[in-house]
Amino acid sequence: MRRLIAANWKMNKTVKETEEYINTFLKFVEHPESREILICPPFTSLYVAGKMLQGTGVKLGAQNCHYEKRGAFTGEISIPMLQEVGCEYVIVGHSERRHIFGESDELIHKKIVACLEMGIRPILCVGEKKEEREAGMTFKVIETQIKLALTGVEEHTDKIDIAYEPVWAIGTGTPATPEDAVEVHTFIRNLINQLNPKNEGKTRILYGGSVNPQNAKEFMKHEEINGLLVGTASLDPESFAKIVYSF
């Protein structure tokens, strides 16, 4: 599979700012078929982004979803709603959802199952906090997060991507080293192969956490890193383009 470079804008950009960004970013996009490019704007910008990205080769994704198709869930958004505006991907279990909004492994599991049932590709985010890393619990934390998220759907791992995002590196300007990332990515790959021996490398494992144009190339030198989930550095179209074409 092609390596995936994903932009997670988080709670940034109005509709007007989204239009300006995409108009600028598309000027930098050449041969998108050589890699998969994904932009995940806030919900209010999904419709206009979907229209502007049609036929460009750049994919559209959402930052979150609910596991039900419809109902009395004030403030939530369903997968069919996302698909109607062109979303092919959705980020599930981002550390900010886990730690700021209290999303549990059980809830994340429900979202993963719903994504698979409804035909949208989830990017499952996993990662350890600083104190867990210092206690030598990195692998245990990640194994638990992955196993709980994928319980009962292990045979469908080929339809899921995983983003390793060490919580201590997100938005701090202090990324994990490429060597740290490779070690964890290798662990995740081995775990996925244990859960589904037929996976055959179809689950891409991305790195996320203070990625920028200066360090992206160092991460992407390693075959164990199948892509990047980019936060702050994706908010500037030229900066994100440099990351996309850093390898």
From Swiss-Prot:
Enzyme class: isomerase
Localization of this protein: Cytoplasm
EC numbers for this chain: 5.3.1.1
Pathway stated in the Swiss-Prot or TrEMBL entry: Carbohydrate biosynthesis; gluconeogenesis; Carbohydrate degradation; glycolysis; D-glyceraldehyde 3-phosphate from glycerone phosphate: step 1/1
Entry-linked PROSITE patterns: TIM_1, TIM_2
Domain of life per record: Bacteria
Keywords: Cytoplasm, Gluconeogenesis, Glycolysis, Isomerase
Listed Pfam families: TIM (PF00121)
Entry annotation: catalytic residues: H94 (electrophile), E165 (proton acceptor)
Record-level GO BP terms: gluconeogenesis; glyceraldehyde-3-phosphate biosynthetic process; glycerol catabolic process; glycolytic process
Listed GO CC annotations: cytosol
Transmembrane segments: none
Binding annotation for substrate: N8, W9, K10, G171, S210
InterPro entries: Aldolase_TIM, TIM_sf, TrioseP_Isoase_bac/euk, Triosephosphate_isomerase, Triosephosphate_isomerase_AS
CDD domains listed in its UniProt record: TIM
GO molecular function: triose-phosphate isomerase activity
Translocase listed as a keyword: no
Record bears the keyword Protein biosynthesis: no
Catalysis performed (reactions): D-glyceraldehyde 3-phosphate = dihydroxyacetone phosphate
Quaternary structure and partners: Homodimer.
Role this protein plays: Involved in the gluconeogenesis. Catalyzes stereospecifically the conversion of dihydroxyacetone phosphate (DHAP) to D-glyceraldehyde-3-phosphate (G3P).
Family: Belongs to the triosephosphate isomerase family.
Identification of the protein by name: Triosephosphate isomerase
Species name: Aquifex aeolicus (strain VF5)
Gene field: tpiA
